[in-house]
């Protein structure tokens, strides 16, 4: 099995300690060969003690070795270290203090040993979990440390096999093809004649494309054959750091020459050697100093908002405990003072015969009460929450709806402690490219020398891809809506659903069969789908390219070949040369297939993510294939018949079997100790020459096509476009690039320098020597916003200058046109350098490369000096298709009350076009565009926009004066009054955003953005993205979520409260930095609206239940103090008191916290506005906490005094009377939990039954066998006696019901008269929808008479009320209207024919504005249902049916409670029948002017009243 490198991400958080480095190591690291004797020693001294490094500082310096150690404990340190870590949690310290306080004789309340049991149990459970995790890490470390590699030995003068853990800095390591790199190694030798090495970094960053690494520049010229014994060079490099994209340093050779070191010279630990027979290098960083392990910091610990609120409530409980204990202490002191003379009759004196003074007795009583009432602080709360969160994550991972079949990936939960935050998100910050779009760049249009080439044929080709997608979805939808008349059973609908999903799955498999088979048999090449590779050239441009080629073929031997071309043709030629060579694309020829064998990935974490934890205990439910993360293909075909599915399945099965055979026969690296020394080198060498070829690769070889592996999809798209015009990139080395042309043949350009792309310059350049002219040319491509500013100034005096201005003006117009069409734009430019200019620039550039400390700054300045006075060649437009389901997902998230901000680096026009396509912007809404050239202009524009917004929404005004804007802003919610206009959207570019994020303007910008419906930030850098998220999070105190797919989104993801990464084509950096990872953007809908809501609701109710339960139990003990002189005595036996919360009542609440579903998933998805309850913290807020505390106090009062009155005149002892009190408390807790439980499963019943059985079983056994264990209690035969007493059963029946009556009454009254959105959703979900026919199925095969296609299309978006039959829908509609319509709006009730069908409306129409101030689009839709005439009824029967709405209220699903709900709702039914039926006068009529979604509900009611 393969193991991923990031599995050791837990290393930093697991407590390992890196070996301490000596402080005098300096600001850089100097490394020399370990084969040389150390300075200051004799030559015979070879090597050094283990763990030591030989450096050029004249002495031995201790550095980290290559041993991987992620464990935290040893056998001796486990117990003290683990306890020390657990005591970092203040709750554990508190309970240990209480347990130790119980050992003081003067204040003890329980037996000391028994009081320690709960806290020891909690500590033991946590310790066992930590021990198991650490042991798993130890086994993983041992396996990795004992992997083998070849290290050069001076004694044997050859490479010998050594363990990874034995590698040291300065050792020479030889690696073969397909071998994992054991440390960070400087590449000194390669079997490739050009000194190249290909590595695969999928284990490190998830990118599947190969990266090129090259031997140190100049080293291969100094030595013809690398020999470690003769290596005397000195390496000076930077100290260890976690920057994967940077390596700075230089190597000084023995002749004094100095060469700069770059990231291209460094082989990183965890990467895999590909397509290279053998390489050798010297170890620079080892062990925990390698960049891979420095980046593996593990999942971040975040504290959820609910947990922060819970900690605050825990402090309130502590304060309440102190107050109760203080009250009891004062009471006991007063009691002792009053009965001082009579105390000797019933109190035990001290050892000297004296009695305690009232003050001393009060102090003792205070501490004793702290011990007795310690259960007020829930000891098991934190452990229970951790258990519930782990189980919640398990069920989220098991959700098949979050599995993406196309990419064979599913949701990953990387943070286990913030699942409830998913249900409280208010702001979503999203990247565009790769997040909202497919990140499949397709060359669409271009302009060269001011002439535009539309590529109409290419547009038609892309249209065929889209048609294929739509045809597939249409066929699937038709198959899914076939109506089977006469099948009314539920099993039939389930069978049809399963069949529909199967057909859809088969269709996907069949339409992508070719791409998937290629992916299964060979490693997937990123950005190389047929849609991306197959470019249809424009005929006019192709003719010009051919003309250039023919002219140059004739004039190539002349002195200036390019001079024979016209300026237009010269630009065309340079344009495609720039597209071909101005990149970092790696070319893989067909005769050089990517070799790959099954090897073990380097690192394995015991619990890297929850998926690893789950795979250890449960088999995977999801079908797993051999497709990579980047295996995305949009090529779809439509099968004409179902029989076409069978061959696809059989072929896939055959290929899967073939792959398994290949995997079994492929060689792998030995990982279990030493292999035999005999023939060891031969086995490594044979492995290096392994050439495994699969049918897919053979097919590619036969086709003779080159494989391009690019770091970005834009580069791949441009290279494929150039190849379509017969300008093919055929080879790339570190110092040359070869291009194939039809008539010219192969042209080899000397590659002098490559200035890579960065987010600040927003461009990249290459410096080459032209083979035809021997000139030094600079080709630059980048964003039009920067390249246009770098062009050579044109003079209007000469004709050439005017012509260039005209070309630039046309090009800019075409760029704007491309952006409006949603295309990504790039400008291509060129500069010719003279030899003097190049020599001057080269000198400064070499100095910048040799710098170690400030290399980035110097290289940036060097690139800026070079990329000036450019000549514009043309521009390109690249299309990036929108992901499937993005518009629908954005619409649902908006209905859920989420505000979506898109932060993209694209051009403003492009971003706006994509925003319209994904429905982020609507064509009918106003868009505020904020573009400023200076900070003063930005401030003025912000003031103007704020004035405009305030004039549109008068209620949304600034409460602070202008002078207070720099200090702070008063953020008021957007007004939702009837006179308020729809909120506009805001678009801002990167330059203006930089000004708006200044301290003086950030409050204005944030206030303006808060008033807008959507925000679109264009040309934003990664730093700006993180600053925007941080600003919203800190200023608005709102829950934020950031989602992205690339490395430029990492900072934004890490700053947000919840970070979501998309496993796209640009690697796994975003996923590795995220809390959750999803395959596609559309899965965010279900993750937030369904699982986020469930997780928040479950944990909120569970935490409240914990506080209620403990407070109620403490209340029983508190009321008893009034009858025992506040002496801190307890009527409940010690065993029950200590283990009640830990054993008897813990399981049911855990089951409810894991499995409860307050609203079904389909209802949450149909009505996303239900999500707002979590945003507003409706289920867990301070008000709910204190109401639960008051309810707990009342229940404890009832549960105490009912058995007290029942046994008032009896002669039972205090512990016999306390046992019924304990049983009553248990029954009350379980019934209370039953009321709060919305979804009952057999596990809920089992948990409640088990708790009851466990309590009575323990009581019976304890009362029989341990009667005198803990004096002074004597519980002998107590429970047996009570079980034979009818009074015991009567009190256990009456007390819980009496205690819960106020809660039952309140919930029934509130659920009937003032229901919340969630309660209405639950009521509607209980309606038996399956017995009525679905209109979509009824009319699937034909259009009903009298209905247009528009009406049928509207039915697809109808709410759940509209899918109900008329009688049920009208009842729910009346119920909603009655709760929201005021007497003024309704007017006088009019006589209504109750046989007239009622008008239908969407769910929660009346209450949609309560939580968020907005409502869904409303409209009355006429619906025809079979059998309507039979279901029309009289007024009496109509009222009777309306009463069924109150038959099962929202507080639970127990049938025996329904009578209370029915009784409380009868009064509302009478009012309902008179006020809500007035709206129905005619059947099938529509409102003339349906209200807009932004309008308030009362405006809609006013229109209805006016219409009636």
Curated annotation (Swiss-Prot):
First-listed, main subcellular location of the protein, grouped into a coarse class: membrane
Topological domains, Exoplasmic loop: 102-107, 336-366, 1123-1134, 1207-1213, 1264-1281
Keywords: ATP-binding, Cell membrane, Endoplasmic reticulum, Lipid transport, Magnesium, Membrane, Metal-binding, Nucleotide-binding, Phosphoprotein, Translocase, Transmembrane, Transmembrane helix, Transport
Pfam families on file: Cation_ATPase, PhoLip_ATPase_C, PhoLip_ATPase_N
Transmembrane segments: 80-101, 108-129, 314-335, 367-388, 1102-1122, 1135-1154, 1185-1206, 1214-1236, 1243-1263, 1282-1306
Cell compartments where the protein resides: Cell membrane; Endoplasmic reticulum membrane
Active site, per annotation: 431 (4-aspartylphosphate intermediate)
Ranges of the Cytoplasmic topological domain: 1-79, 130-313, 389-1101, 1155-1184, 1237-1242, 1307-1508
NCBIfam families for the chain: ATPase-Plipid, ATPase_P-type
Described function: Catalytic component of P4-ATPase flippase complex, which catalyzes the hydrolysis of ATP coupled to the transport of phosphatidylcholine (PC) from the outer to the inner leaflet of the plasma membrane. Initiates inward plasma membrane bending and recruitment of Bin/amphiphysin/Rvs (BAR) domain-containing proteins involved in membrane tubulation and cell trafficking. Facilitates ITGB1/beta1 integrin endocytosis, delaying cell adhesion and cell spreading on extracellular matrix. Has low flippase activity toward glucosylceramide (GlcCer).
Protein's UniProt name: Phospholipid-transporting ATPase VA
